[in-house]
Amino acid sequence: MTKRALISVSDKAGIVDFAQELKKLGWDIISTGGTKTALDTAGIKTIAIDDITGFPEMMDGRVKTLHPNIHGGLLARRDLDTHLKAAQENGIELIDLVVVNLYPFKETILRPDVTYAQAVENIDIGGPSMLRSAAKNHASVTVVVDPSDYERVLAELTEIGETTYETRQALAAKVFRHTAAYDALIAEYFTAQVGETKPEKLTLTYDLKQEMRYGENPQQAADFYQKALPTDYSIASAKQLNGKELSFNNIRDADAAIRIIRDFKERPTVVALKHMNPCGIGQADTIEKAWDYAYEADSVSIFGGIVVLNREVDKATAEKMHPIFLEIIIAPSYSDEALAILTNKKKNLRILQLPFEGQAASEIEAEYTGVVGGMLVQNQDVIEEKADAWEVVTERQPSDDEKEALEFAWRAIKYVKSNGILIANNHMTLGVGPGQTNRVASVRIAIEQAKDRLEGAALASDAFFPFADNIEEIAAAGIKAIIQPGGSVRDQESIDAANKHGIAMIFTGVRHFRH
């Protein structure tokens, strides 16, 4: 009996060559619409789908393959006489191979000018139905959704006359992943269209971006996936200009770095980061000077760190960065001279180019945190804060210079692991105390880092001070300006201690925990 293949593809790459090889092997080919036209034009004889169904394609192509003569030919079990008898009695011929890929829904909704009606018209119905029918009956039917599998299928058909069960099962698994992701994307689009923020079912679809050597540690397997609808301002979308492949830890650190610099848009700024914590942030009138400040902030911790700059890297800045061992540099652009300097004898230095225009859109994405047996979903910690809404709770008002330092420190503290303390002046961080289990320990670490540079400095705390002992430590170091959320039942004790030492203290009313 002659084997039959049904081919209906939107992505026609390689399909003519594939069909020609099938014909050489003696297969009949059933086809539809544009695919049939392409194959006929190439001189490949095909059978029209309506010759199988007895019905013409109708309703602008919405109805063409949803017919028992198609799905019966796909779903009939070859090992059951009752199925084969039913097919014979109803004039249904068996279909042994299905090659289908789907309407380009993703590509359609990514177009900036797409209309709702256009999106709806690009939801494939018949394609997924054929794929699922064939995949369900993979014991007998080969199903191909990815052109990269053409070669594998042809090789087996040529060598042994059929595909192996292992191949059919693997291809069926790929189909079910593909149709699930396709439907998830449609669900995501419709959920956004109706403004639903707490769907009872959460379906996310991601594409494999990079197979990784290992995860956070060598004993952990890992891979990197990118959202099916890519975010422009993201590490997954960055263009790598130089260096080794990004590691798991590189990606996490780089993501943290580009989040931080989103909050420093107005002036040239450089952020240095290590293990998800900023170790130096500098801002100035030029990117070169901002680098100077970021490096000066902590010239020890920056070794082996990640640096992100929010302006083009110029020659002068590159010359200063080149001698320092860095894992990654990220910037919106690089001058030709700067790139030549940075790559000279630095083949392993990872240099990424990232378009900063997409920052605002990246801020509205939800954050997903995996826990054993579940997942937490929250908005990013992005909130517009205005200094004139803050409250000075002490007798002494901060000076103008202190106000600038307090505002700078408050922007930066948001990205320090809790319990987090950060000391800064108006243009650079001076000391960072991250991730301690009690706040006074974080205060001591930050002060120790900044101890020789505390003149005119301000201190920020990501959450309230639970006891006045923190204020006593800060006062003993000579710091005269503090910014914190407030909200402790013992706030008055902290205020009294600040007043006793002549410290100006601001309550923002906004907490910035970071776990």
UniProtKB/Swiss-Prot annotation:
GO terms for molecular function: IMP cyclohydrolase activity; phosphoribosylaminoimidazolecarboxamide formyltransferase activity. This is Bifunctional purine biosynthesis protein PurH. The keyword Disulfide bond does not apply. The keyword Transferase applies. Its EC number is 2.1.2.3, 3.5.4.10. PANTHER family: BIFUNCTIONAL PURINE BIOSYNTHESIS PROTEIN ATIC, BIFUNCTIONAL PURINE BIOSYNTHESIS PROTEIN PURH. The IMP cyclohydrolase activity resides in the N-terminal region. It catalyses: (6R)-10-formyltetrahydrofolate + 5-amino-1-(5-phospho-beta-D-ribosyl)imidazole-4-carboxamide = 5-formamido-1-(5-phospho-D-ribosyl)imidazole-4-carboxamide + (6S)-5,6,7,8-tetrahydrofolate; IMP + H2O = 5-formamido-1-(5-phospho-D-ribosyl)imidazole-4-carboxamide. SMART domains: AICARFT_IMPCHas, MGS. Coiled coil: none annotated. SUPFAM superfamilies: Cytidine deaminase-like, Methylglyoxal synthase-like. One of its GO terms (biological process) is 'de novo' IMP biosynthetic process. Keywords: Hydrolase, Multifunctional enzyme, Purine biosynthesis, Transferase. InterPro entries: AICAR_Tfase_dup_dom_sf, Cytidine_deaminase-like, MGS-like_dom, MGS-like_dom_sf, PurH-like. One of its GO terms (cellular component) is cytosol. Pathway: Purine metabolism; IMP biosynthesis via de novo pathway; 5-formamido-1-(5-phospho-D-ribosyl)imidazole-4-carboxamide from 5-amino-1-(5-phospho-D-ribosyl)imidazole-4-carboxamide (10-formyl THF route): step 1/1; Purine metabolism; IMP biosynthesis via de novo pathway; IMP from 5-formamido-1-(5-phospho-D-ribosyl)imidazole-4-carboxamide: step 1/1. It comes from the Bacteria. Residues 1-145 form the MGS-like domain. Belongs to the PurH family.
